[in-house]
């Protein structure tokens, strides 16, 4: 590493894989919306309070012994409840220890899904336009995103373009 004046150390450049990433388009649009007082339709900003029953229960459990991180894939009782609900809703036999994982949000869920199925140098079809994380998730998994355009006005894909993407 090179030295700067007064003994400072120059930090290593960021990795090559990060060179194609930019700031979040969604967050950039949020800043613009806020600047002009526009209504932000891009993120979940509810303009109402949670139901009182939920607030009351949260207040109760804050004083109980549930103040530690759950296991990585989610608390057992929560996964059991999700498996029971989704089994009924989806008409499937779901095992809470094999078929259910709890994440901090959709971004983590999508990344976990991509990391579960992608190996380095795999090809991943990404329809374009796309949610900004799809291409980045592929790259971070070591896969190569292959962009296939969706055509307005109904944003259908062209069958030949999709077939060519697999070649």
Where are these regions (language model features)?
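Short, Lys/Arg-enriched N-terminal segments with co-localized hydrophobic residues
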Residues: 1-10
